[in-house]
Amino acid sequence: MLQSLAGSSCVRLVERHRSAWCFGFLVLGYLLYLVFGAVVFSSVELPYEDLLRQELRKLKRRFLEEHECLSEPQLEQFLGRVLEASNYGVSVLSNASGNWNWDFTSALFFASTVLSTTGYGHTVPLSDGGKAFCIIYSVIGIPFTLLFLTAVVQRVTVHVTRRPVLYFHIRWGFSKQVVAIVHAVLLGFVTVSCFFFIPAAVFSVLEDDWNFLESFYFCFISLSTIGLGDYVPGEGYNQKFRELYKIGITCYLLLGLIAMLVVLETFCELHELKKFRKMFYVKKDKDEDLVHIMEHDQLSFSSVTEQVAGLKEEQKQSEPFVASQSPPYEDGSADH
């Protein structure tokens, strides 16, 4: 009897604090994933770093042996200055003198990476005035970019995701959840093909020292806004039509980022993923927890825009992936 009471009380305790338990496991899982990544990266990259260090020491020792008139401190000072300039995107190589980092097209590419928070790091402001302007420009430009992307993604999502799903649901009678899942998978496949595989093949042809894997790596690092900066297109010494190439890359990165956000928004609106996310949200038991700062208690690109714009008609279609009463149509088909 006591055991059954204790068991039932434990079950009630777990159910009462289920959200807290799920959140705790989420934090633990994230920390373990961080540790897992660190272990894998360290085990894979550390041997290559050690080999590179040994190779550089051998080259340096051989160079000093062949040039006895040059002392090691002088060489260290020269190499330090070269590496410092390289961090600012300035190369000492003679065949790299023709590439300017701050002409208009390069500055346009830099501005796009700053506003999208990609930040490759291959080119950075040299002067104090440039650094100060970069701070002010980013403080204003990054929220402006978020507003711009929010508006674009909301409009694109209506035409690319919501209306097609609603059309197949009403016109053909398919389950809205099934249509939404199939549509999300197809949209993801098309996006990966158009903004990853095809551009990677193009970059592997245009960039002399890039293979397909390195090109695909650049596309992923860029469109996910990681922006490590180890691969930056258009920096080759014999790059033809460099200005036009830089403008094309800027357009590709902007369109690719919009496409990625549309796909992300499409998957986030799936009913199954919404239920999964709610497992980790705090349970609103108190009255003060029910007070919404915003009109909708959710954060998504489309919902934010709907709150700002107040588009009630679009708001009716903002939940196309859950079962709801279909709007009446005389012909049994959508009028759009």
From Swiss-Prot:
Changing G119E: Abolishes potassium channel activity. There is a cross-link at K274 (Glycyl lysine isopeptide (Lys-Gly) (interchain with G-Cter in SUMO)). It holds the Pfam family Ion_trans_2. It is a multi-pass membrane protein. Residues 1-20, 157-181, 268-336 are cytoplasmic. Residues 293-299 are annotated as: Important for intracellular retention in recycling endosomes. Residues 310-336 are annotated as: Disordered. Inhibited by quinine, quinidine, barium, and internal acidification. GO terms for cellular component: apical plasma membrane; brush border membrane; dendrite; endosome; inward rectifier potassium channel complex; membrane; perikaryon; plasma membrane. The record marks L146, L261 as: Part of a hydrophobic barrier that is stochastically dewetted and limits ion permeability. Glycans are attached at N95. Sumoylation is controversial. Sumoylated by UBE2I. Not sumoylated when expressed in xenopus oocytes or mammalian cells. Sumoylation inactivates the channel, but does not interfere with expression at the cell membrane. Sumoylation of a single subunit is sufficient to silence the dimeric channel. Sumoylation of KCNK1 is sufficient to silence heterodimeric channels formed by KCNK1 and KCNK3 or KCNK9. Desumoylated by SENP1; this activates the channel. Desumoylated by SENP1; this strongly increases halothane-mediated activation of heterodimeric channels formed with KCNK9. Residues 42-103, 123-132, 203-211, 232-243 are extracellular. It is found in: Cell membrane; Recycling endosome; Apical cell membrane; Cytoplasmic vesicle. The record marks T118 as: Important for increased permeability to Na(+) when K(+) levels are subphysiological. Residues 104-116, 117-122, 212-224, 225-231 dip into the membrane without crossing it. Disruption phenotype: No visible phenotype on standard chow, excepting a lower urinary flow rate. Mice appear normal and are fertile. When kept on a low phosphate diet, both wild-type and mutant mice show strongly reduced urinary phosphate secretion. Still, mutant mice display higher fractional urinary phosphate secretion relative to wild-type, leading to reduced inorganic phosphate levels in blood plasma. The impaired phosphate homeostasis seems to be due to indirect effects on the expression of other transporters, such as SLC34A1 and AQP2. Coiled coil: none annotated. Belongs to the two pore domain potassium channel (TC 1.A.1.8) family. Homodimer; disulfide-linked. Heterodimer with KCNK2; disulfide-linked. In astrocytes, forms mostly heterodimeric potassium channels with KCNK2, with only a minor proportion of functional channels containing homodimeric KCNK1. Interacts with KCNK3 and KCNK9, forming functional heterodimeric channels. Interacts with GNG4. Identified in a complex with PSD and ARF6; interacts only with PSD that is bound to ARF6. Interacts with UBE2I. Ion channel that contributes to passive transmembrane potassium transport and to the regulation of the resting membrane potential in brain astrocytes, but also in kidney and in other tissues. Forms dimeric channels through which potassium ions pass in accordance with their electrochemical gradient. The channel is selective for K(+) ions at physiological potassium concentrations and at neutral pH, but becomes permeable to Na(+) at subphysiological K(+) levels and upon acidification of the extracellular medium. This is Potassium channel subfamily K member 1. The lineage of its organism: Eukaryota, Metazoa, Chordata, Craniata, Vertebrata. The gene is Kcnk1.
